[in-house]
């Protein structure tokens, strides 16, 4: 039995999705059972998770799992990229710890993960109706602007207006939904004119992620949330910033995050 006892206390929704999917992928590859913490354990030690108020149990049906906490030897993620040694030789009875931000840990069970990450019916129907009413089945671009905690964190550089301009030049003449934790900043930018751009006003991470998954093309921020939006959508075109990390983390590789029709700018 392998576990991830810190699931729900080591990052918010999108990080939890990577951790859950990677735990399941590693367990399946090694032929082990796995266990995840109960919902009551989420946010008990991570203030950001508690403040955010959204976790994987809120928006997905993960009832077909083993729940609980088991004391296991900690197995720490050794690198930011895919760890083939861990994937192929992870021992049983360990507790995974880290972020595991690459689809390569679960690409062999992609259909299972997509099934696990189906949005709950009420949320999906609300978002689907919004798209039908406002875009009448037109192809739409998801554009993500992450600011919030990034404003004061050099390890996660803010993306410039110029980055978004260059990305949009690659996808001309299409409607765009702008998703952001700082909609006031987005509304103040001349680039986001209302004739083409709609600023998401959902004010919730779960609705934004669901709406992202209903878009056809994706312009990412350096954020795992928009990464998941593109993955869930099986995006036909993904544009992502080269400067995913900065500061002390500037040399971290993100090559193992790339999938599908992906372009770095």
Model-assigned labels for residue ranges:
Residues 3, 39-170:
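Secretory-pathway luminal glycosyltransferase catalytic domains
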Residues 8-18, 152:
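A short, glycine/small-residue-rich beta-strand->loop->alpha-helix junction that serves as a flexible
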């Amino acid at each position: 039995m392998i576990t991830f006892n810190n699931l729900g206390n080591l990052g918010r929704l999108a990080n939890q999705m990577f951790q859950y999917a990677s735990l399941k992928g590693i367990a399946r590859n090694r032929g082990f059972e796995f266990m995840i913490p109960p919902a009551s354990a989420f946010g008990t030690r991570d203030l950001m998770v508690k403040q955010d108020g959204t976790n994987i149990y809120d928006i997905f049906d993960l009832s077909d799992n083993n729940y609980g906490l088991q004391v296991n030897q900690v197995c720490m993620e050794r690198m930011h990229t895919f760890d083939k040694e861990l994937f192929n030789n992870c021992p049983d009875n360990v507790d995974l710890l880290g972020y595991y931000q690459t689809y390569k840990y679960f690409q062999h069970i992609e259909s299972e993960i997509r099934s696990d990450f189906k949005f709950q019916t009420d949320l999906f129907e609300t978002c689907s109706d919004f798209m039908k009413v406002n875009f009448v089945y037109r192809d739409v671009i998801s554009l993500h602007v992450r600011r919030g905690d990034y404003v004061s964190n050099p390890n996660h550089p803010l993306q410039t207006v110029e980055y978004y301009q260059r990305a949009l030049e690659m996808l001309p003449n299409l409607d765009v939904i702008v998703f952001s934790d700082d909609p006031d900043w987005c509304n103040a930018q001349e680039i986001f004119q209302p004739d083409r751009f709609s600023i998401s006003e959902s004010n919730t991470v779960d609705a934004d992620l669901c709406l992202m998954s209903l878009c056809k093309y994706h312009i990412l921020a350096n954020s795992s949330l928009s990464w998941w939006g593109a993955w869930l959508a099986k995006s036909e075109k993904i544009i992502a910033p080269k400067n995913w990390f900065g500061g002390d983390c500037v040399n971290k590789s993100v090559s193992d995050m790339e999938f599908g029709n992906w372009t770095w700018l």
